[in-house]
């Protein structure tokens, strides 16, 4: 447990806060593995190049990530020299569904979700 007065603890916590423009999409209906294919293609690229890659990528996750990237760009102040510093997908909850099969059997279908985060930074 941290020592000190409550206001001092809050001041220290706010001083360490990350001020880079970012955006997070929670409970995206795409698996982490499929989202990472698209995220690996844009990691480290500048914003305009990444938007071009996402525009012509046929995967479903690219449309979600494109909207998320545009949101992160709007959170930033200077949009000319932004690049993607971090982008990652974390595992979310899994919806369990039942698919009827032959001879009275039932298979379980797992519909996976993910939490996708994009953090931008300015080139120096």
Stretch-by-stretch model annotation:
Residues 47, 95, 107:
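Short, flexible micro-motifs
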Residues 2-89, 115-123:
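Ribosome large-subunit tunnel/peptidyl-transferase-proximal elements
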Residues 102-124:
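C-terminal edge-of-domain segments
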Residues 27, 32, 97-100, 109-111:
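Generic structural "secondary-structure junction" signal
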Residues 38, 100-103:
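Short acidic (Asp/Glu) patches
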Residues 89-101:
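A short, conserved strand-capping beta-turn/loop at the end of a beta strand
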